[in-house]
Each structure stands twice: as C-alpha cells, then as structure tokens.
Amino acid sequence: MSRKDGVLALLVVVVWGLNFVVIKVGLHNMPPLMLAGLRFMLVAFPAIFFVARPKVPLNLLLGYGLTISFAQFAFLFCAINFGMPAGPASLVLQAQAFFTIVLGAFTFGERLHGKQLAGIALAIFGVLVLIEDSLNGQHVAMLGFMLTLAAAFSWACGNIFNKKIMSHATRPAVMSLVIWSALIPIIPFFVASLILDGSATMIHSLVTIDMTTILSLMYLAFVATIVGYGIWGTLLGRYETWRVAPLSLLVPVVGLASAALLLDERLTGLQFFGAVLIMTGLYINVFGLRWRKAVKVRG
C-alpha cells in the first residue's frame, strides 16, 4: 500500500472512530433506527439527481446496500437493544476484518503469507484484550453478542460485494456506488422504526429535533458515509482484502481515545496495551513486506 493510500485509510479510521461519539450524541433525541434511516436519506438525496446510476448488475448493488448498510446497522442496533453495551459492541464489530479476510480467500482465492498471518494474529489478540477489558464486570446477553457478530459478518459481506462491484467490467465511480446504494436501506429502516418505536415516537423526534441532532446527522451522512465509505471502497478495489480490512481494527482504538477526550471516559492500562498490540499487528500485516524490502536495500 502506498504512503498516500495509507494516510487515506487512517483518515477513514479516524472518521469512523469518532462515529461512536457522534452517534451517542445523536441518539439523545432520536430512535436509533430512525436516525439510521435519515442518515442514508441524506446520503441519497439530493445527490442522486446529479450522480449517474452505477452500471453494475442490480443483484450486486442490492447485495451491497442490504449487507453493509441495512443488515449491519439493523443487527447492531438490535444487539444493543438486547443488552449488548455500546462500547463492547464497537469492539466486537471489528471481527468484520477477519470475516472479510476469510471470505476474500474463499471468494477471490487470495493467498496469505506468513508475515500477514502473524500480523493478523497479533491484531486479533489485541482486540480480544480490548473486549475482555471492556466486558469485565458487565453482563452481556449471548443474543446481543451473537447479533453483534452478525453485524460484523454483514459488514464483511458488504466488503466482498464492494470488491466484486469494483472488479466488474463496467467499474463504477465509488461515489456513484455509495450514493445509489444508500437508497436501498431507507425504507427498511423506517419500517423497522415504525414497528419497534411507533409512529408517535417518530413524529415527536422530528418535531423536537435540535441542532445537535442535525449536526450529528450531517456528520454521519456526509463525513462517515460519503467520505468514509467512498475512500474505503476505493482502497478495497485497489488492494487485496487482507491489506485493507485489518486497518478497521484501529477504529475502536480511535473510538476509545475520542471517548476519553470528548466524553471524559478514562482509558485503562489494559485498553492501552490492546491498542498497541493492534497497531503493531497492523503494521506487520500492511507494511511488513515493504519494510523487509527496505531493509534489504539498505543492507
């Protein structure tokens, strides 16, 4: 991965890491499924009138939108509703990186080398350290945990659909894919919110919406979705999944740090240790081969 693309990947990590703080603020005055529906509605409109529809098979477009946009967030919100704490949920969700690597190996025949396996194993251990520390002393319902894993698997499936789309003969512009696929989850989210929250709650949240919620929606729609998924999709189309997917493991690290800075949540020593393990594993996985070549040249 080039240095420029590495910087872009880290930008996405920071944007998505801040997501959890923004979501927490946005949910103060709005039901989660409705917030998600409005998020994707802002992504799609009015941009859809100015961006051409991606020329890819409809089944791939539907698969992408239903997995990475609807299923991921529907499973995640239901998991939290069934007792999964938000903090640990953000960590367990990063299992998507490993699901993506496995699915990429089966779908595209991508091969992993020893250095990549070692780096991924180290990063996995770091995530387990973070999860163990976050779950310590908290009762987590197994259903909530399994639903969070389902959300992670949905994200991974979306990554595979993204790579298939970007490898198609009529490769679309990434922004076109992000905007048009945002149409797909809007109605499912609003219907789910209507069933779970009721029309009175939905109407009340719209009537009483404040500037904080509006700014949260703008960040989630324009920064986290259009910019974040736009860059992420470009990188997945350019590199092997094992180079890109593990970078998302840095998201909970940024999430923990931003929560400590912005929400005054303290970072424990074990969380810091887990974050260091993840960053070391990612460095080996993504830049290990380049570092090895550089050493040979210098030698």
Show the residue positions of the predicted features:
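Hydrophobic alpha-helical transmembrane segments of multi-pass integral membrane proteins
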Residues: K4, M34-A47, G63, G119-L122, ...
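Membrane-interface helix-cap regions at the ends of transmembrane helices
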Residues: L18, V22-V25, N29, L42-P57, ...
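Hydrophobic/aromatic residues within transmembrane alpha-helices
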Residues: G26, L35, A79, F106-F108, ...
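Specific alpha-helical transmembrane segments that line the substrate/conduction pathway
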Residues: M34-L42, F77-R111, Q116-I120, A151, ...
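Hydrophobic transmembrane alpha-helices of multi-pass small-molecule transport proteins
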Residues: M41, A47, L103, L112-S134, ...
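Membrane-interface capping segments at transmembrane-helix boundaries
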Residues: V286-R298
